[in-house]
A protein has these predicted regions:
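Active-site cleft segment of glycoside hydrolase catalytic domains centered on the general acid/base Glu
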Residues: 150-154
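Outer-membrane beta-barrel pore domains
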Residues: 18-21, 39, 45, 61-63, ...
Length: 299
């Protein structure tokens, strides 16, 4: 009977941020998750965000074969490496890169603020198993395109596809595609992404390029991350992160340079310190220094 009960987990992320323009304490995330198995090949998950109350995950997943699985509900879109592989408790930085935020539903140019999630269905799987992972992996799905807990505002469905190659343990190469129309006016929303990641042992190296069209606006950006696990509890990392909101205007570029330190002395506590310099190409916008400290309590 106990095996049928859901596993309960969660975390709280809170901290303080100072910049040239402001300073504030903040609560970034407060999440509670319930997950379990309904049957041997059928699992579920429900995750609730309390910082700004909403359901962020609610899905059923049927896993009959390694090569073919079905997921239905609300969950992370299978686009980019960071969106699905680097959840907040694994991520080396406090903030995600600009290109992911602006083009994949975090603080999207189309108006969505959905933490890279949507409601829909996807097929996914992997081929050529070796040492606990599949060398060739795919995801293909259809989604509302409206974000969290929102019914579709048009009759069109958005299509997302990703192909991931893992030639060796810790190494992955991924390409992603998103096509959609959002809102009652069927405005164009197209995204392309390509990236590579090596994360094994002490080494963390990762980079992605993401571009897209939102209505009539073309945008693009990319980031590069490098980190080194000095010990099992200490990880320093740096990131170069640049984004052109309007690809035709160089003055729309923002570039962030971030140095980060993550320290996790025990399983249930994670401490992060970030320094970011925000550089703006626009002549009338000054650069900005940002220092942020965030603590994660995990249960």
């Amino acid at each position: 009977m106990l095996a049928a009960l859901p596993a309960i987990s969660g975390y709280l992320q809170t901290g303080y941020e100072w910049s040239d323009n402001s300073s504030s304490f903040f609560i970034k995330r407060v999440r509670l998750s319930l997950s379990g198995n309904i049957a041997p090949k059928l699992d579920y998950r429900v995750q609730i965000e309390f910082a700004s109350p909403k359901i962020v995950d609610a899905y059923l997943c049927y896993r009959p074969f390694d090569e073919l699985n079905l997921q239905l509900g609300e969950y992370k879109l299978p686009f980019s490496i960071e969106n699905t592989e680097y959840v907040p408790l694994r991520y080396e930085f406090i903030e995600y890169p600009l290109s992911l935020c602006k083009l994949m539903g975090f603080n999207d140019l189309c108006g969505l603020s959905a933490t890279g999630r949507d409601m829909g269905a996807q097929l996914f799987g992997g081929f050529f198993r070796r040492d606990g992972y599949s060398i060739l992996n795919y995801n293909i799905g259809v989604f509302n395109g409206e974000g969290l807990n929102v019914r579709d505002k048009n009759k069109s469905k958005d299509v997302v596809a990703r192909l991931t190659l893992k030639p060796a343990a810790g190494l992955q190469l991924a390409g992603s595609y998103y096509w959609g129309e959002y809102g009652a006016d069927y405005l164009k929303r197209v995204r392309y992404g390509a990236g590579a990641c090596y994360d094994r042992g002490p080494v963390v190296v990762r980079g992605e390029y993401i571009c897209g069209t939102t209505g009539d606006l073309d945008s693009e950006g990319w980031y590069a991350v490098a980190g080194w696990r000095v010990t099992k509890t200490l990880l320093p990392a740096v990131r170069y992160d640049t984004f052109l909101e309007n690809s035709a205007r160089s003055s729309s570029r923002q570039t962030n340079y971030t140095a980060a330190l993550t320290w996790q002395p025990v399983k249930y506590l994670r401490c992060q310190l970030n320094y970011t310099y925000e550089d703006y190409a626009a002549r009338d916008v000054s650069g900005n220094n940002v220092v942020a400290l965030m603590l994660s309590g995990i249960f």
